[in-house]
């Protein structure tokens, strides 16, 4: 067992050895290193063929047409291209966008940018279980609403939004629907023939592919138009210029191929580990699971340990690689905005830890983690005067704290 134990799969995954092996064949002189846009010689043709194969592998996971896949540098760029691209192209029809308060920063900050450009954005509050209410969404829709952006699976709490129902609603109102599927692709089945979703952001490194590569699914029927955000040689049918990184694209394709093949196996494996971890900590006092437990991917468990400071718990769990909040926001010491949106108070939001596991996590590692968590929480609570007061039956909300 290698320490520290990696339990932060929602931040990134190790590259699957099968993926790494494939990628190496597309870089050096004895490999296929050509530019896929070089049309005049075999080096280019072979690289283009490799890209086409990967495009098909990615499309297959979504049951899409390969021509609907546009390569980007990752889900952040895909979110930017989808939201800015659609909002700008359709701005004559209206300048109102709807999203939720628990979206990834790549969606929220892109929407903030649109607001600076004169768009109006409605940020929906989720229910306390993290799910978006359809009636609230419908109530927010207006005649000038051009875009709705709701993520499939939340990166902090793992809840699965009902994008099928949301898609039906958007289509009936002729509103473009964008879904950030960085955390769901390869974990939950996505079928674009069934789902009325127009734009889907995808990432490779969340499903055992390389970092720095992603894609945007852009529906052809009914056709969705976007304004390009990256200008240049007109690559990717003009949606996204820039030389295609063949080795990364091949890696993403292989990762998606394996994900489709192993989806059920990976799912059951994660579920067994999640239940094992949950069973190991649920008898502890003052422990809360954040987010709906049923409508959720099994790869994620977000737990609040009351009366323990999240940062000090992270430090005490030095042999576990876990996070409080998401990797993208843990650089700031603010409590998680996702947990705040669920209605958790600052203290509880600050005392939460996200455990996320995956293909290479073992039962032995989970058992070790349980032991570490129990010891660390007990030790920190022993040092906490608040814990003593709680144990004495004092309602901490009624205490008048002296201000220094």
UniProtKB/Swiss-Prot annotation:
Residues bearing N6-(pyridoxal phosphate)lysine are 206
Protein's pathway: Cofactor biosynthesis; iron-sulfur cluster biosynthesis
Q: Which reaction does it catalyse?
A: (sulfur carrier)-H + L-cysteine = (sulfur carrier)-SH + L-alanine
Q: Which Gene3D superfamilies match?
A: Aspartate Aminotransferase, domain 1 (3.90.1150.10), Type I PLP-dependent aspartate aminotransferase-like (Major domain) (3.40.640.10)
* Family matches, as SUPFAM superfamilies: PLP-dependent transferases
Cofactor names: pyridoxal 5'-phosphate
Which of this chain's residues are annotated to bind pyridoxal 5'-phosphate?
Answer: 75-76, 155, 183, 203-205, 243
Q: Which GO terms describe its molecular function?
A: 2 iron, 2 sulfur cluster binding; cysteine desulfurase activity; metal ion binding; pyridoxal phosphate binding
Enzyme class, top EC level, equals transferase
Q: Catalytic positions?
A: 328
Where along the chain is [2Fe-2S] cluster bound? Answer: 328
Kindly list the places in or outside the cell where this protein is found, as annotated in its UniProt entry. Answer: Cytoplasm
Report the GO terms under cellular component. L-cysteine desulfurase complex
Keywords of this protein's UniProt record, alphabetized?
Answer: 2Fe-2S, Cytoplasm, Iron, Iron-sulfur, Metal-binding, Pyridoxal phosphate, Transferase
Query: Which EC numbers does the record give?
Result: 2.8.1.7
Please give a single GO biological process term from the UniProt record.
[2Fe-2S] cluster assembly
Q: How does it assemble?
A: Homodimer. Forms a heterotetramer with IscU, interacts with other sulfur acceptors.
Provide the function of this protein. Master enzyme that delivers sulfur to a number of partners involved in Fe-S cluster assembly, tRNA modification or cofactor biosynthesis. Catalyzes the removal of elemental sulfur atoms from cysteine to produce alanine. Functions as a sulfur delivery protein for Fe-S cluster synthesis onto IscU, an Fe-S scaffold assembly protein, as well as other S acceptor proteins.
Family listed:
Belongs to the class-V pyridoxal-phosphate-dependent aminotransferase family. NifS/IscS subfamily.
Name the record gives this protein: Cysteine desulfurase IscS
